[in-house]
């Protein structure tokens, strides 16, 4: 099968941690299919001299990738973002498909990426599916302009793939037909993310802790809705209570400077360490080195970083948002209310003083092989339905629900 994948959320040499889950899915699909990717890059980055190049992980994936420049109007005329992205990627699309016609089109993020997937499906008369990741169906629909775009993309796509049951319910609440929405959970690369010796992992990442000091990791993009300010305030409370916890923040983003200043104002610069971006293959050692992982976002879908953490034998504390509850088994995790620094501090204390780490080491993750299998099976159904109109789709085996 020839599969065209469209999404801005995809890694390159300068941004190796962006959309690693999409690369993992495409890599696994490419084992039995031909996969080509179009991942537009903002013209603002290009003007700054940041031209996307293939990273080693993408180059070794067996997937052909194009990074066209995305021309758009920042912050206004957002209803035209889909059309602007489509216009921007036309040359790359024509080049990738000159002697190669896709049998199926897959996109990630409802708008504008999903609109481009929808247009590509129409252009090539191929079934199209869009993967929704979280805020695109939790927050964007509240916008009067982009909300209409999201609903149209989800309604007109042949299938909508959600990464959690909670997001599936959100799609249904938007009026999307139930027979067009499927939950296919993301996987974990168990060859990389598995438990191991903590001391050896700490040596590999260059961390040395004082006697009695604990290590917590936070992984993500440093943007407002990730609420790292809450983590900083929780850290101050823990320090005041005599808890010695070092927080290593792995990632980059526009809010870093603001949060560095907050950490200084709260007197916790010795506990809060901004590490910067870390390659996806190196994250496993950070998880193994840590005593727990933390997320404190106001909004999430079903973040893979938490399952990667548990797959490495490390429990987590997270705000109870999005679909996180679906994977938050109480024996290896603690959920706390969003926006509450004191509750976050108490949750961290609970995990550090409990037996959560032992339980985390028993976790068996779902693999990307399973995710790719379910995705390919869905496309086979959609293609079969086009060849035999009126035939109802058979149920997909939802083996993802077991993990």
Question: Language-model segments: which ranges?
Answer:
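N-terminal subdomain of nucleotide-sugar transferases
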Residues: 1-57, 390, 402-403
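Carbohydrate-associated surface elements
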Residues: 41, 166, 187
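A short helix/loop element that forms part of the nucleotide-sugar donor recognition site in Leloir-type
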Residues: 49-56, 194-209, 356-358
């Amino acid at each position: 099968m020839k599969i065209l994948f469209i999404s801005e959320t995809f890694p390159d040499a300068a941004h190796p941690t962006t959309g690693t889950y999409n690369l993992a899915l495409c890599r696994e699909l490419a084992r039995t299919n031909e996969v080509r990717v179009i991942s537009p890059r903002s013209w603002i980055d290009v003007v700054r001299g940041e031209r996307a190049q293939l990273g080693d992980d993408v180059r070794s994936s067996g997937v052909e990738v194009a990074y066209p420049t995305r021309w758009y109007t920042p912050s206004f005329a957002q209803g035209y973002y889909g059309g602007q992205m489509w216009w921007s990627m036309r040359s790359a699309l024509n080049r990738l498909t000159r002697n190669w016609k896709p049998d199926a089109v897959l996109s990630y993020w409802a708008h504008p990426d999903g609109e481009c997937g929808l247009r590509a499906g129409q252009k090539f008369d191929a079934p199209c599916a869009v993967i929704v990741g979280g805020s695109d169906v939790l927050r964007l629909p509240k916008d009067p302009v982009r909300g209409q775009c999201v609903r149209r993309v989800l309604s007109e796509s042949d299938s909508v793939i959600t990464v959690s049951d909670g997001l599936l319910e959100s799609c249904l609440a938007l009026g999307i037909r139930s027979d067009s929405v499927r939950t296919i959970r993301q996987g974990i690369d168990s060859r990389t993310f598995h438990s191991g010796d903590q001391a050896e992992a700490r040596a590999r990442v260059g961390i040395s802790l004082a006697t009695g000091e604990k290590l917590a990791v936070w992984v993500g993009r440093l943007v407002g809705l990730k609420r790292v300010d809450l983590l900083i305030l929780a850290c101050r409370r823990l320090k005041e209570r005599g808890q010695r916890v070092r927080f290593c923040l792995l990632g980059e983003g526009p809010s870093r400077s603001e949060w560095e200043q907050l950490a200084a104002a709260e007197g916790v610069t010795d506990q809060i360490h901004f590490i910067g971006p870390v390659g996806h293959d190196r994250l496993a050692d950070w998880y193994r080195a840590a005593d727990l992982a933390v997320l404190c976002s106001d909004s999430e879908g079903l973040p893979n970083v938490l399952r990667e953490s548990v797959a490495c034998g490390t429990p987590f504390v997270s705000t109870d948002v999005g679909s996180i509850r679906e994977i938050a088994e109480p024996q290896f995790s603690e959920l706390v209310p969003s926006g509450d620094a004191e509750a976050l501090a108490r949750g961290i204390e609970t995990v550090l003083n409990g037996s959560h780490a032992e339980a985390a080491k028993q976790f068996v993750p779902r693999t990307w092989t399973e995710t790719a299998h379910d995705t390919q099976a869905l496309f086979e159904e959609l293609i079969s339905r086009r060849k035999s109109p009126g035939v109802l789709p058979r149920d997909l085996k939802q083996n993802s629900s077991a993990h």
